[in-house]
């Protein structure tokens, strides 16, 4: 539930809140998204007791020895004021609205407005290019980074993923670069 605090309208449903699902659910969360602590590699899991020992063995061998300053920062983030999180989410909302409107103004793009997180996932089938081809072309010719929808599996064909975790100005510039690229081909 790493994006559970970054939503714009309806709060996301936790599977653990569904009657009978708590004992069948593993919740993984961390500090990277909500508290902008990306790369600090600190998170936690909530799970049925019978899984704890096995998960602990896995974690000790894959991600151990979290630095003490990181742990202290996590405590401060959890116990401190949360108004910074709310302000960050509102800024993401502003960027989402403007960026998705910009994408929807591009020929061949259709972008549903995401309800949370900080990604836009437009359908690009109207461009006539595959996800991989447009991903490569935008990076090479327009200087705009995205991710091919096929990075998420075969059903991602026809889509790109863009992050809105950048400045408003850079996002608007990216839309214009994409527009210029589409005009030039």
Regions found by a protein language model. Give the residues of each.
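PLP-dependent class I/II
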Residues: 1-185
């Amino acid at each position: 539930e790493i994006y559970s605090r970054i939503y714009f309208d309806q709060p996301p449903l936790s599977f653990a809140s569904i009657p009978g699902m708590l004992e069948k659910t593993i919740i993984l969360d961390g500090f990277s998204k909500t508290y902008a602590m990306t790369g600090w590699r600190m998170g936690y899991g909530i799970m049925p007791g019978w899984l704890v020992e096995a998960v602990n063995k896995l974690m000790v061998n894959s991600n151990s020895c979290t630095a003490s300053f990181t742990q202290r920062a996590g405590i401060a983030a959890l116990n401190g004021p949360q108004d910074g999180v709310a302000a960050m989410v509102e800024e993401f909302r502003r960027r989402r609205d403007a960026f998705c409107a910009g994408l929807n103004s591009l020929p061949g793009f259709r972008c549903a407005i995401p309800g949370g997180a900080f990604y836009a996932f437009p359908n690009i089938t109207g461009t006539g290019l595959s996800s991989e081809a447009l991903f490569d072309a935008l990076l090479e010719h327009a200087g705009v980074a995205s991710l091919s929808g096929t990075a998420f599996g075969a059903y991602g064909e026809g889509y790109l993923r863009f992050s809105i975790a950048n400045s408003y100005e850079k996002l608007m510039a990216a839309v214009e670069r994409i527009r210029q690229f589409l005009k030039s081909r």
